[in-house]
A protein has these predicted regions:
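Short, solvent-exposed beta-strand-to-loop segments that form ligand-recognition rims
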Residues: 210-232
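Extracellular carbohydrate-recognition regions
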Residues: 3-56
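Secretory/extracellular carbohydrate-interaction modules
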Residues: 78-161
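Short, aromatic/His-centered strand-loop micro-motif at the edge of beta-sheets
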Residues: 164-193
Length: 261
């Protein structure tokens, strides 16, 4: 079993009054045995040598927004789905994360509308493309062979976030949030941070409000990916109607995992 790795980087956790034990966990992030990627999109251009981007048809690929607007002063990238049904925009890091290395990803996002849209944030066994990880959410079927993600899909019966995963083409038992759960669904033009933390063949799912406060309970899925398979941290957004385009903004994209020989 790999060593434990920090899955919660929120400022609220540091200020939670739990003392030196919590602080020591955060010091782990500066140790030599952690591989990490942290992007606040402050450079003015997307690092295309690192990211794979996909934009179908009339969709607009992710690009850095001008920092002049106060809403973008922390560095923001935007992807646009276009107004064609089932058209998508997606962004991923390379295929170099593993459950065996306890890889974690965190994405702070906001979306322009929460009707006729599908959003996935998580790990998958291919880089960004026009195909999502989850085909259908009500009775989950998958395009990926291995991977797990937070999924929100207005084509589903319940319009809330669901934690889903697939291991060697076998679907895990997912969890769909109740409508009464904290952070159960995206809120229009409001930031939320979604975290997926792999632990060998399993994964933990958590979510945080715009000010970094934890929302609801952490969810654990078992057998939701194959720990030895390389996965790509990915954000995928798909239009679910042909009448209106959807924008998704990403404030930060983080990934970290254990470094091993």
């Amino acid at each position: 079993m790999a060593d434990r790795i920090v899955t919660d980087l929120s400022d609220v956790r540091l200020r939670s009054g739990m003392g030196a034990a919590i602080t020591s966990e955060f010091l782990q992030m500066n140790s030599f045995d952690i591989c990490k990627w942290e992007d606040d999109f402050l450079s003015g251009v997307l690092t295309t040598s690192v990211y794979t981007s996909s934009a179908g048809g009339a969709a607009t690929a992710f690009a850095v927004l001008a920092p002049s607007a106060s809403a973008n002063e922390w560095g923001v990238i935007r992807g646009v789905t276009g107004a064609t049904d089932d058209q998508a925009v997606a962004l991923s890091l390379p295929l170099q994360c593993k459950g065996d290395y306890n890889a974690v990803m965190a994405v702070r996002y906001r979306i322009s509308a929460i009707t006729t849209v599908k959003v996935e944030i998580g790990f998958r066994d291919t880089v960004a493309s026009q195909t999502g990880t989850v085909n259908a959410l009500d009775t989950p079927s998958f395009s990926a062979t291995n991977g797990c993600c937070w999924a929100f899909d207005t084509d589903a019966t319940v319009d809330t976030w669901a934690a889903e995963g697939v291991k060697a083409s076998s679907a895990a038992t997912g969890v769909t949030l109740a409508t009464t759960a904290g952070g159960a669904a995206p809120v229009v033009d409001t930031y939320q941070t979604m975290v997926v933390a792999l632990m060998e063949d399993n994964a933990y799912f958590s979510r945080y409000s715009a000010d970094g406060r934890k929302q609801g309970d952490t969810i654990m899925l078992t057998d939701c990916n194959t720990g030895s398979i390389n996965l790509a941290p990915t954000v995928y957004v798909q239009n679910r109607a042909g009448s209106a385009s959807r924008n998704i903004d990403i404030d930060f994209f983080k990934m970290w995992q254990l470094r091993r020989s």
